[in-house]
Amino acid sequence: MYDLFSKYDIQKLHTLSSSQTNKAFAFHVQTPTCYFLLTKRENQGKIELYDSLPNKYITFKLHKNIPIPLDFSSIINKFLKLTNKYGRLDVIKTNLPKKGVKIIEHPNVKFPFKNVKTTTLNKNKAPELQIRYSNEELPFNNQPKIIMGHKMYGFPYIDKEGSYGICSRDNYVIINKELKEMELIKEFLSTEVILFVFETTRYRMRYLEKYVFEFIPDFSKIDDCWNMFDNNNVDIYKLFGITKEEKEFIKNYYKIKYKYF
């Protein structure tokens, strides 16, 4: 589908989220949809995407392997300025354990290995790791890492000692970082702006997609991030040049104010 979209000149593209699609089709369809104006000629390297934040079409440049956002391309364009300069945040999407591994809820002598299955929200809207135990050591055990286990919002958790393996699919893991780098990355990922950016690639219902990390820079490589972090003054809005009006829109986007690890 991406190759088809990028082959021809799509002059204007308007997307509908899963909830918008559901309403448009009398609550019978939930997959995100779109409509567009196409000219059958070679693409011009850009698309005019409808952006509901400024309520107008925004130019989005097409790049190989860079996804097309469903919305808020004005914000994504600001992210890509830093991502193109410093490189994207490298994440690993986890798979199911190999065949033959057994998983249980409570540990015993034969099942001593701790693993993260997923992350859920408690009644106070705070994230909690859901732990399971395996009879074999699973991937990422004994490896310091950031775990993003919530299937919609990630919610980064630092496993400093590498205490956990991962026993389920569709978790995201960041490895090969020093502890201070992980702390900095977690600080920037634990923001409403990042939750907002996650909305731009909800291609399958409301799941967190790996595609979105193509938009997000490696914060540990940016000097301004270190200056903010070292001075205990992380301002992700300032980092990306997000305006006062955009900031207000983002802060009002989520009715629920989530907590972080």
What are these regions (language model features)?
Residues 1-22, 35-38, 185:
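Conserved Class I SAM-dependent methyltransferase catalytic core
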Residues 245-261:
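Short, amphipathic C-terminal "tail helix"
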Residues 5-6, 190, 251:
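Alpha-helix boundary recognition
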